[in-house]
C-alpha cells in the first residue's frame, strides 16, 4: 500500500504532544460488513488481508468523497487493515496506539490478537499495544459498528433516514479522526490537568503518571522562561503549583498561551511532554458571565462542524482555522459547537485565536427515557470533558440539546446525573444541562427562539428582568423557566437565504426558519433588528446566531457550505454584531 501520502499530517493534540510519534493516516485496506459477520469470518487475522476488496483514505469516513469510498447508505459495520513497521529501538519503549475518534463501537486487533474495545463515536481513546507487537511488520485491524437508528447511542445530526432532510445530514461511520502511534518510556505522564489562578498568576497542576519519579515543570511565554517547579512523585498522582513571573491573561481575540514542558525522570526512562495553557477565569455574577472579571456579551454563532467533502472531518488543518477566521471577521467572538464534540486540533486554533466556544455532546439519537442511556452517554461525555478540560477557549459545557422527547422520570434523573458529574469533573466552568429545552438543573438559563419578526422579537426581550418569562417557548408544557440566572439566547435567527444567482439550482428540500427575505436589504434589516433586540436587553448575556455556514439542505448560513460568500458586502452584519451590549456597560 502507498503510505507515503499522509492526509491531515499535523499533530492531532498539540496540548499533549511528544516528539516521538507516527501518524497512521493514509491508505488502509477496507471492507464493508453488512452482515456484521466479519469477526466470525476472521477478518481480524493477518492472513485475511486478501479478503479486503477496497482501499480507504483515513481519517475520512466511508460516506465522504475524500475517503475514496463515497458510500451514502446505512453501514452497520466496517473493517480497516494495514501494516505497521516497528523497529527494535521502538519496542524498547511502550507503544501507545491513539484514535482521535471512531464512530461508534470499536474493536482493535494487533497481529490477530484483540488489543481493546471502545464505545463512543466522539471521544478519543488510547491502547498500550506493546506486548502484542514484534520487530518488523505488524498487522493492525480496526472493526467499527454503528447503528444510528437504535436509540441507544448519540448520533448528533447524522440522518436517521436514508436521505438528509431538515436539520439531519450525511452520516459518519468508523474512523473520522487521526490515528497515531506514540513511543514513550515505561514511566510516563498519562494525563495532565491545569487550573489557572489569575489572581496569583499561577497554574495548579494535576498529573497522573505510570510510576513515580522526579518531575520538572517549566513555563515559557514568547520563548522566555517565566516559571518552573520540581516535584518528587512517590505514587502515581501529583498536584503542585507552577508560579509565573509574568502574568498574561488569555482573553477575547487575544489568545495568550504559556508553553509548558514536563520532564518526568523515573527508573523507567525519561518522558518529555509538551503542552500549553491559558490564564483565564469564567465566573457568574448575577445575570452576567465574567471572563477574567469582566462582563462579556457572548456574540456566538452556531458551528456544526460539517464539510462537503469530508463530512465530519475537515479536509485540512487550514480548513479548521478558516472557520474561526470567517466567524471573527463577521464580528462574532465565539461559537456554540453544535451536536458534535469537535476535534482537539480545532480547539487548539480557538485557543490561539482567543475564540470562545461551548462544548456540546451529540446527544440526538439517544433515547434518554431509557435508563440504559446513561451507560452509553456518561462515559463518552466524561472522557471528552477530561480530554478538553485544559483548553481555555472552552468557557462552558452543554451535554444535551433540545431533549423534546423527555417524558419519564428516568430522563429527569439522567439529566441531573450528567449535570452533577460534569460539575464534579470541572467545577471551573458553567454547565447548561439541556440547551433550549427542559432545564432540570443549570447554571445558565438558555432558550431557542426563531421568531423572524424583529418587532415582536424585540418586545419579547426588551422587558426581560430575570424574574419572569416574557419570551416565546416552543413547547410551554415541556419547558421550565428558571429565574435569577444569566440568560443566553443560544439559538435565534436562522434566516433562510440563497443568493439570487444560485436559486435556480437550489435543492427542492432546502430550508431555513420562517419565510425567507425577498431581497438582501430585507435580510440585513431583519438581521439588524433581531441582534439589536438582544444587545439592547440589559439582562441578556449572549446570543448564538444560526448559523455560520449552510449544511447540505439547511441554507440559513452566512456562508455557503463550501464557505463561499453569500453577500458581496457584509458590513451591515459586522456592524450589527459589534454593537456594544447593554450588559457590558
Question: What feature does the model see in each segment?
Answer:
Residues 1-66, 143, 147-152, 222-224, ...:
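Accessory carbohydrate-binding/adhesion or oligomerization-edge regions at the termini
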Residues 10, 14-15, 20, 29-35, ...:
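Accessory beta-strand-rich segments of carbohydrate-active enzymes
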Residues 28, 112, 179, 258, ...:
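Conserved, mostly hydrophobic/aromatic
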Residues 110, 202-231, 238-240:
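Beta-strand-rich binding/interaction modules
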Residues 115-116, 226, 296:
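Short hydrophobic beta-strand segments in globular cytosolic domains
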Residues 163-172, 186-193, 280-294:
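Low-complexity, Pro/Ser/Thr- and charge-rich linker/hinge segments at domain boundaries
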Residues 204, 324-325, 334-564, 583:
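Substrate-binding/catalytic cleft of secreted carbohydrate-active enzymes
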Residues 261-327:
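N-terminal carbohydrate-binding accessory modules
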